[in-house]
């Protein structure tokens, strides 16, 4: 059975306007440059990590090893995923767009709907991918282990016990994360606190003042809750990265260079194929096909703070 389709459009003599869909969550962790991308991982890629103990010692006349180098590795293995949809062209015959389909018995899928469909499916995949990056679980259909699953399984990660975050406690909780950041990382250019939209909203509200958390009645620049205009956020000198796929009350403090996303070909994430079945089996179906690989991995666990 072909996938059920539902079209909402308007018609006034000629086709007017574009299809309107609900705003889609973009894969902002990728598009915003929040993690390191490995775009050409054919099957798997080994990420080498190394650690040195005390590297300087008192001088002597002899050569003596001053440090021990410990090598380790993490394996980034993208998971194969796919999208398969089938649409019946007859579903469009009674639509106001029938004029654009041509008058042949073998109607062609309207070009503007095809464009919309490609964008819609790609955006849906991007939204799911954003969630997978942070909260995915490999055991679930269409998912791979996200960062939170990997961090929870790594004993070397710096764990911070979390709670339900509100505007009243968000500053204290962010403070716990910053306090747990290793001294060697604080101040690094690519260090971020990755947080959910929920936490970012609570932080913005707290900085709006009105007595919240003792900040006074007027908030930032005496603008109250109107102070925020969508710009970058920071806390105690550490930049905040709002990751829409992050679990509601979770935070991760890490360097971008220590978080990796791997895929076979980067372009696969924005490629959807439409296959008209009329010439193949005589049906009125159009198939939408998308295949890609995706996965994430962390580098050095001891350099990551996980609040949960």
Protein language model features and the residues they cover:
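Sequence/fold signature of self-assembling virion shell proteins
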Residues: 2-57, 145-168, 204-308
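Intrinsically disordered or highly flexible coil/loop and linker segments, enriched in small
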Residues: 25, 126-135, 187, 212
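Long, hydrophobic/aromatic-enriched structural stretches that serve as scaffold segments
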Residues: 56-115
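Short helix/loop capping segments that flank catalytic or ligand/cofactor-binding pockets
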Residues: 95-96, 130, 202-204
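Short coil/turn segments at secondary-structure boundaries
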Residues: 97, 133-138, 188-196, 216-220
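Alpha-helical scaffold segments that mediate packing/assembly in large oligomeric complexes
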Residues: 98-180, 307-308
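Ordered core of a single globular domain
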Residues: 172-210, 219
